[in-house]
């Protein structure tokens, strides 16, 4: 499954390559999204598509084997993967410092499998596709940057009873 997801991400990058190739200031970023007690690897590629306007496209893939939670006589295992995109306006403070507020859209594919507590037998699967808006900021110092974004987790995909916020933290390198 992960191989298919990586293939999909590479296909999307290849389709968007002409946009990145013609524009200035490309960057690549990598980090982690903390999603409901679940860590998801995040990779992103972006560039300046208009003067001071940055656009990026990224991919999220699971790092671990999945989050597990117990519900009475059942336990559940959750797997998450997704895509994200963001658009930002770069504010150049000086030659070495730029701040880019970002808004974006995050897509998550979530699969939750339920198992019997005592026997470990499979009981049911719940699969969902969710889109959530994101807010964030990218801070660049010379050629190194930090991207922090957040979005509210849909309560239908959370194994927690409380409202949760996903946080994506990535280090970026500007070419």
Can you describe what each PLM-predicted range is?
Residues 26, 39-45, 81-85, 131-135, ...:
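Hydrophobic, lipid-facing positions within transmembrane beta-strands of outer-membrane proteins
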Residues 30-42, 93-95, 154-165:
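Solvent-exposed loop/turn segments connecting transmembrane beta-strands
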Residues 139-145, 162-175:
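Outer-membrane beta-barrel "beta-signal"
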Residues 55-57, 61-81, 107-131, 154-162, ...:
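Flexible, solvent-exposed loop segments that connect beta-strands
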Residues 19-69:
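Short glycine/proline- and aromatic-enriched beta-strand/turn motifs that initiate or cap beta-hairpins
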Residues 1-25, 175:
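Cleavable N-terminal export/targeting peptides
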Residues 26-28, 51-57, 95-99, 141-148:
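Repeated loop/turn-to-beta-strand initiation elements of outer-membrane beta-barrel proteins
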Residues 32-36, 59-65, 91, 105-111, ...:
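Transmembrane beta-strands of outer-membrane beta-barrel pores
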